[in-house]
């Protein structure tokens, strides 16, 4: 059993305590003021991550495992490996062996399918390999990987029956890469708990005469993901979203260039350029995911004047509630021992996954 003393920070409170744990938290004993030299926060939860450190989900299990390890070293103790839009065969080959090889000591818990059922006129950096809604495709992927989330465009033909099928199979539906109007979104939101993918980006906007996906999200949604690298979304837009959406949570949308030096790279057959912590399609201004870590997002939230409790909420707790992951996202007796230790300047000291300190 391990014992640590420090300031525990949850989404709704902070207090000094001594915490005893192995795989789960056994005891939390509140103490008098120790120091602010050590913060203990819940491990980060990233529900949208394509890659990192030169590895990409679409390159198969070995790459998935290595990119997950990279993000674990930066505090992400729960992660969804996220696909790009591609051919059914490429996606299947990329995810083959996912469930078979998944370890109980991994930070991976499943996959997020970003596409291929998106609007070909709102691709962003996604390849032009969109598909029509297909239950058969989902059934094939379910045999090899646990699909937690899927991003799709609700305006596509055949989507109403498809969304109903996905909900029956406990797959969270998120709207993204879409040109749907407000009424189209609202129709689904009245029936299902719909999420939204990288809010503001690759979706119809908040036009006052022709409200779109963003309008529907800001007015009606309980949960949405947002990239807080401060390249995809401005400080002001983040704060507007947070006022409107109580369960707003940050994701990285990180690609394989995360952790690499500036230069040109190819991931999932997509040519990109990384320059000063920003990544675009080669010879284009179109953003192509991010190179942020969840810890980068956490620090950015603090820098734009969110409290540390609010930053914890947006980097861990809200995502846990969205996916109903009841044993993480909170430092409490009986919960998994997934947490990040920070110094007084909020630099990462150590990361614990299932009670084990990981090698960085």
Where are these regions (language model features)?
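N-terminal metal-binding scaffold of metallo-dependent hydrolase/deaminase domains
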Residues: 1-33, 352, 356-357
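Conserved, mostly hydrophobic/aromatic
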Residues: 37, 48, 113, 166, ...
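Residue-level marker for buried hydrophobic side chains located in beta-strands
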Residues: 43-45, 111, 174-175, 250-251, ...
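Divalent metal-dependent hydrolysis catalytic cores, especially in the metallo-beta-lactamase
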Residues: 50, 65-91, 106-119, 145-155, ...
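Active-site gating loops and adjacent loop-to-helix segments of metal-dependent hydrolytic enzymes
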Residues: 70-80, 120-144, 186-203, 213-221, ...
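Active-site core of metal-dependent hydrolases
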Residues: 143-262
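His/Asp/Glu-enriched, well-ordered alpha-helical/loop segment
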Residues: 213-223, 243-252, 258-342
């Amino acid at each position: 059993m391990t014992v640590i003393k420090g300031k525990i920070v949850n989404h709704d409170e902070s207090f000094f305590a001594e915490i005893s744990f192995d795989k789960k938290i056994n005891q939390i004993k509140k103490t008098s003021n120790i120091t602010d030299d050590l913060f203990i926060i819940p491990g980060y939860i990233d529900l949208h991550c394509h890659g990192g450190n030169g590895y990409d989900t679409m390159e198969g299990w070995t790459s998935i495992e290595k990119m997950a390890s990279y993000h674990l070293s930066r505090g992400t103790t729960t992660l969804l490996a996220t696909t790009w839009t591609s051919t059914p065969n490429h996606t299947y080959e990329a995810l083959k062996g996912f469930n078979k090889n998944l370890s109980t000591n991994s930070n991976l818990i499943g996959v997020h399918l970003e596409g291929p059922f998106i609007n070909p006129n709102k691709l962003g950096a996604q390849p032009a390999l969109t598909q029509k809604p297909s239950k058969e495709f989902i059934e094939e992927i379910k045999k090899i990987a646990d699909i937690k989330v899927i991003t799709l465009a609700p305006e596509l033909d055949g989507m109403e029956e498809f969304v109903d099928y996905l909900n029956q199979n406990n797959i969270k539906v998120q709207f993204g890469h879409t040109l749907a109007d407000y009424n189209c979104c609202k129709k689904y939101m009245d029936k299902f708990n719909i999420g939204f993918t990288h809010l503001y980006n690759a979706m119809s906007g908040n036009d006052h005469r022709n409200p779109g996906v963003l309008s529907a999200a800001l007015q009606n949604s309980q949960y949405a993901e947002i990239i807080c690298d401060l390249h995809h979304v401005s400080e002001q837009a983040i704060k507007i979203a947070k006022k409107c959406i109580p369960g707003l949570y940050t994701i990285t949308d990180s690609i394989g260039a995360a952790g690499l030096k500036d230069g040109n790279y190819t991931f999932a057959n997509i040519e990109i350029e990384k320059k000063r912590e920003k990544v675009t399609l080669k010879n284009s201004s179109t953003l192509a995911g991010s190179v942020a870590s969840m810890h980068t997002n956490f620090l950015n939230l603090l820098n734009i004047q969110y409290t540390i409790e609010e930053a914890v909420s947006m980097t861990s707790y809200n995502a846990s509630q969205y996916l109903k992951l009841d044993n993480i996202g909170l430092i409490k007796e009986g919960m998994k021992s997934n947490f990040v230790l920070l110094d007084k300047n909020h630099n990462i000291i150590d990361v614990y996954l299932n009670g084990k300190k990981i090698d960085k």
